[in-house]
Amino acid sequence: MKERYGTVYKGSQRLIDEESGEVIEVDKLYRKQTSGNFVKAYIVQLISMLDMIGGKKLKIVNYILDNVHLSNNTMIATTREIAKATGTSLQTVITTLKILEEGNIIKRKTGVLMLNPELLMRGDDQKQKYLLLEFGNFEQEANEKQENALYLIIILSRTSIT
């Protein structure tokens, strides 16, 4: 028998019905486990996140989970937009995002946040590796741009003084 859609024929086997004693010939078919396109939600991390957060903060987390783009695990929104959409205060949003950052659940740049792909993602193993690299570099890029901007300001201020 030919392999089809990950199913492999492994021969036949005789089974005996315990009640009737009838011998039944059956084909043994197995399906290969593939790591194709999937959405992974890691329950342990989700539960630990929910333990850290409660009430209105949970509303913010749900908003993030509902609005994150699963193609790249990012969400474009300011803290004010999140506060307005969730009906929570700006301070609650800021506090919640800080808790999520400290728990390595999200990383932020101005107006953009990225959800840790170990928590939730859609794709295969290759995409998970790619998103994990992106998550690791996400904050670093923003810090480098900020440092470069400060360096330029210092240089410009020195040249305008002389």
Curated annotation (Swiss-Prot):
Gene3D superfamilies according to UniProt: Winged helix-like DNA-binding domain superfamily/Winged helix DNA-binding domain (1.10.10.10)
Assigned keywords, A-Z: DNA replication, Plasmid
One annotated GO biological process: DNA replication
InterPro entries according to UniProt: HTH_CRP, Plasmid_replication_RepL, WH-like_DNA-bd_sf, WH_DNA-bd_sf
Gene name of the encoded protein: repL
Protein name: Replication and maintenance protein
Key word Coiled coil present: no
Source organism: Staphylococcus epidermidis
Alphabetical list of SUPFAM superfamilies matching this protein: Winged helix' DNA-binding domain (SSF46785)
